[in-house]
Amino acid sequence: MRMELISVIFFFFCSVLSSSALNSDGLVLMKFKSSVLVDPLSLLQTWNYKHESPCSWRGISCNNDSKVLTLSLPNSQLLGSIPSDLGSLLTLQSLDLSNNSFNGPLPVSFFNARELRFLDLSSNMISGEIPSAIGDLHNLLTLNLSDNALAGKLPTNLASLRNLTVVSLENNYFSGEIPGGWRVVEFLDLSSNLINGSLPPDFGGYSLQYLNVSFNQISGEIPPEIGVNFPRNVTVDLSFNNLTGPIPDSPVFLNQESNFFSGNPGLCGEPTRNPCLIPSSPSIVSEADVPTSTPAIAAIPNTIGSNPVTDPNSQQTDPNPRTGLRPGVIIGIVVGDIAGIGILAVIFLYIYRCKKNKIVDNNNNDKQRTETDTITLSTFSSSSSSPEESRRFRKWSCLRKDPETTPSEEEDEDDEDEESGYNANQRSGDNKLVTVDGEKEMEIETLLKASAYILGATGSSIMYKAVLEDGRVFAVRRLGENGLSQRRFKDFEPHIRAIGKLVHPNLVRLCGFYWGTDEKLVIYDFVPNGSLVNPRYRKGGGSSSPYHLPWETRLKIAKGIARGLAYLHEKKHVHGNLKPSNILLGHDMEPKIGDFGLERLLTGETSYIRAGGSSRIFSSKRYTTSSREFSSIGPTPSPSPSSVGAMSPYCAPESFRSLKPSPKWDVYGFGVILLELLTGKIVSVEEIVLGNGLTVEDGHRAVRMADVAIRGELDGKQEFLLDCFKLGYSCASPVPQKRPTMKESLAVLERFHPNSSVIKSSSFHYGH
């Protein structure tokens, strides 16, 4: 009887165990769960071994055979790695782990899931290369690996997948050439990478609707074959590369917006505003460009009589010197041709000069009503230039030149100015060059003739890197008209002089400006390492996200920003538009704050003048240019001024309601940037609100929140890391009164040195 009872109990337990055993797909997902280190939202809490299958788990869907079809956990704040075991889910068709914090490489065996149709791992921290095994996913329809840290070359077999229609790989570090193919792709975004080489001629097909390869290092000409198979309504963005030559005369390219070709100084033709030079156009050329002989002379044999000129349609059967032209006739033809060419040259030169004289005379007549027709040099040390200094500037008439300057040299100089992007047509009259540092050596002609390279552009201005003949380098912003008028110059000049007096190691130095009839230039020191939105430092658009900067450099950047803002506030100024694109990095990665003072010029809004000549200089309405539009292309000497539009995510909430800027606005922007430096990702408003509840006991939580790339450097420094997080959240508090001052914020950061774990005591309290 006892044996029978034991047998019944044994079989009962066996049946229970067999009925509750988790299937193979569930076991694979449990391995995935074990690879997740942080799950702050407890989304994986329902995943356990008690179920027969994972079909009831959060983020999982199955087929009728309890096999996993979908794994979807986007925006879940998960931290971990992608396990190779996911490749064992042989029926998996859709995988979405976007906008999390998964890191590490993509395992090769991960691509054994051959049924995958949708793969989205965007906005993570995945590194390494894309394995060539991705070419085995023949059913793949959509691939989104954007906003990661992937590098290496793009697999050639990726472009050959016959079902792939959507490919998004932007904001990574891919290099090498773009493989040819992509015949069935409809959406292809490879922007903001390090791709070089040339565009392949066999690229895309009739299905293509969107192509973006902007902000790369692609060089060479645009192959004419590249648009043959494109539909006419396709969008093609080739901006900010190193492309050269003419844009193919194809409806595909002619239908594009001109800004889709900007940032390529070597490109010419429609739809850009840079026409291609036509060698046969009637113009006066320099002696170096003139062939050694005229066409008539070039057609004559080198030795008279050795190869006589004959009728090309006749057969030369009996060469006879007497059938050719006599030497006297030949000499007469040559002399006549030379005389004719000389007469034509004189006529063209006369017409050219007359037209230029007429333009200059008209301009001078208009300008005499308001100002003198000399170019004045002003400095802070003297309100007006001496006569000797004024004589150093020449009137820009087409007929006026130095004695040693030839007409061809004049034209070469004009061509250089046009290629540099500067307009030299209006350089007389009420033009004014103002230098704010006493540099009397800088002349407007010297600046306008400098070698210039386009660094970036916005709707209101273009930024150039200007290299003078003596080797000095400046950042020159050419401002658009945007309603700028001469009558505003009287208000602008004292304003820009006040801005020029703000000299600090963590501020971009304003060297001067030029106010002309058709040219408004603002001159800065050139800052070589670009801004925090440079692809070398950032991960994704719109955020600093400096994933590849060590903790020591990040702390240095935070301290420098705090010092610069504290100085501005001490001088009774407000920046009002602080964001990563306005944080520039010098040779030693010392930050320099830019974009203070230009809003006054562009908008003409009333500034709030205080005692001592200081002023409030910004409006609250901002338009934030994206990293793809500007600054991601490399060194950005000065950020773009903002025009009226949408608010920046770095603007304080109260700036929506108030037109008068406050130092608390800058504190808010600093707090958001500090949190991005700490976490290595964009910080949402919800996270800022939740983070304000950090307590002293949350040291381990602060470590988990920190960027994975710097956690090793912060070992044993949890207390200071927690203080940094609390400072960032306090600065970004939605309540202005709870934000510390920049002086207090700087005091917190100065307590810690990156190479030391000693933290000095501080009397600063958060949330006061």
From Swiss-Prot:
<feature type="glycosylation site" description="N-linked (GlcNAc...) asparagine">
    <location>
        <position position="242"/>
    </location>
</feature>
<feature type="signal peptide">
    <location>
        <begin position="1"/>
        <end position="21"/>
    </location>
</feature>
<keyword id="KW-0325">Glycoprotein</keyword>
<keyword id="KW-0732">Signal</keyword>
<keyword id="KW-0808">Transferase</keyword>
<feature type="glycosylation site" description="N-linked (GlcNAc...) asparagine">
    <location>
        <position position="163"/>
    </location>
</feature>
<feature type="repeat" description="LRR 4">
    <location>
        <begin position="139"/>
        <end position="162"/>
    </location>
</feature>
<feature type="modified residue" description="Phosphoserine">
    <location>
        <position position="662"/>
    </location>
</feature>
<feature type="glycosylation site" description="N-linked (GlcNAc...) asparagine">
    <location>
        <position position="196"/>
    </location>
</feature>
<feature type="region of interest" description="Disordered">
    <location>
        <begin position="301"/>
        <end position="324"/>
    </location>
</feature>
<feature type="glycosylation site" description="N-linked (GlcNAc...) asparagine">
    <location>
        <position position="233"/>
    </location>
</feature>
<dbReference type="Pfam" id="PF08263">
    <property type="entry name" value="LRRNT_2"/>
</dbReference>
<dbReference type="GO" id="GO:0005524">
    <property type="term" value="F:ATP binding"/>
</dbReference>
<keyword id="KW-0597">Phosphoprotein</keyword>
<feature type="region of interest" description="Disordered">
    <location>
        <begin position="361"/>
        <end position="432"/>
    </location>
</feature>
<feature type="topological domain" description="Extracellular">
    <location>
        <begin position="22"/>
        <end position="328"/>
    </location>
</feature>
<feature type="topological domain" description="Cytoplasmic">
    <location>
        <begin position="350"/>
        <end position="768"/>
    </location>
</feature>
<dbReference type="GO" id="GO:0106310">
    <property type="term" value="F:protein serine kinase activity"/>
</dbReference>
<feature type="modified residue" description="Phosphoserine">
    <location>
        <position position="531"/>
    </location>
</feature>
<protein>
    <recommendedName>
        <fullName>Probable LRR receptor-like serine/threonine-protein kinase At4g37250</fullName>
        <ecNumber>2.7.11.1</ecNumber>
    </recommendedName>
</protein>
<dbReference type="InterPro" id="IPR032675">
    <property type="entry name" value="LRR_dom_sf"/>
</dbReference>
<feature type="repeat" description="LRR 5">
    <location>
        <begin position="163"/>
        <end position="183"/>
    </location>
</feature>
<feature type="repeat" description="LRR 8">
    <location>
        <begin position="232"/>
        <end position="254"/>
    </location>
</feature>
<feature type="glycosylation site" description="N-linked (GlcNAc...) asparagine">
    <location>
        <position position="64"/>
    </location>
</feature>
<keyword id="KW-0812">Transmembrane</keyword>
<feature type="compositionally biased region" description="Polar residues">
    <location>
        <begin position="303"/>
        <end position="320"/>
    </location>
</feature>
<feature type="transmembrane region" description="Helical">
    <location>
        <begin position="329"/>
        <end position="349"/>
    </location>
</feature>
<feature type="repeat" description="LRR 3">
    <location>
        <begin position="115"/>
        <end position="137"/>
    </location>
</feature>
<keyword id="KW-0675">Receptor</keyword>
<dbReference type="GO" id="GO:0004674">
    <property type="term" value="F:protein serine/threonine kinase activity"/>
</dbReference>
<feature type="repeat" description="LRR 1">
    <location>
        <begin position="67"/>
        <end position="90"/>
    </location>
</feature>
<feature type="domain" description="Protein kinase">
    <location>
        <begin position="449"/>
        <end position="756"/>
    </location>
</feature>
<feature type="glycosylation site" description="N-linked (GlcNAc...) asparagine">
    <location>
        <position position="144"/>
    </location>
</feature>
<keyword id="KW-0433">Leucine-rich repeat</keyword>
<dbReference type="Pfam" id="PF00560">
    <property type="entry name" value="LRR_1"/>
</dbReference>
<keyword id="KW-0067">ATP-binding</keyword>
<feature type="modified residue" description="Phosphoserine">
    <location>
        <position position="451"/>
    </location>
</feature>
<keyword id="KW-0547">Nucleotide-binding</keyword>
<dbReference type="InterPro" id="IPR001611">
    <property type="entry name" value="Leu-rich_rpt"/>
</dbReference>
<keyword id="KW-0472">Membrane</keyword>
<feature type="modified residue" description="Phosphothreonine">
    <location>
        <position position="553"/>
    </location>
</feature>
<feature type="repeat" description="LRR 7">
    <location>
        <begin position="207"/>
        <end position="229"/>
    </location>
</feature>
